[in-house]
Amino acid sequence: PTCIPVSGDHQSKLTLMSESLRNDGRIWVPKIKKDAASIREGKISPLDISEDNRDYFLERRYPAFGNLVPRDVASRAAKERCDAGFGVNATGEAVYLDFAAAIIRYGKEQAHIKGEDESNQDLVNKLGTSVIKKKYGNLFQMYEKIVDQNPYETPMMIYPAVHYTMGGIWVDYNLMTTVPGLYAI
């Protein structure tokens, strides 16, 4: 499942987000590792990465499904990108979920329906943001409260998380069980 990565002491655990966000958002990481490192170090923001330098890895790998691949596929792909050094938050364990294209798409659609100027960027952004706010406003508000970034303007940072277990044994992130020195592989 999709979650907000831990971003500081104020957040004791991962915060689960709705999978429905992937219906409209586009998932990406920088194509260049140096850019990912600069983001992790706080030297640049995701808005500094040009469209050409963004890797929409789910759309690239699964063109027929894009960001709507099953969540286990999306989770594995996001973890693989982060493990390869392209993760974007301070820990390197996050990818971006970007709503800019959806805001424009919905904004143009709404302008067309209302008979208004579809080329007016301010109008399109206002109308599109309104649609996204109606669909995901509570999730965006929760995200902004935790991360202190406006997800209507800056891509969200997300990461896969365990949602529930289906039996088995407990292990930590290094696959060590509760028995010291015993690992489950």
Please describe what each predicted stretch is.
Residues 149, 159-163:
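Short loop/turn motifs at secondary-structure junctions and domain boundaries
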Residues 174-185:
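Short FAD-binding loop at a beta-strand-to-alpha-helix junction that anchors the flavin cofactor
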Residues 154-158:
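Short coil/turn segments at secondary-structure boundaries
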Residues 138, 149-153:
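Hydrophobic packing and interface segments
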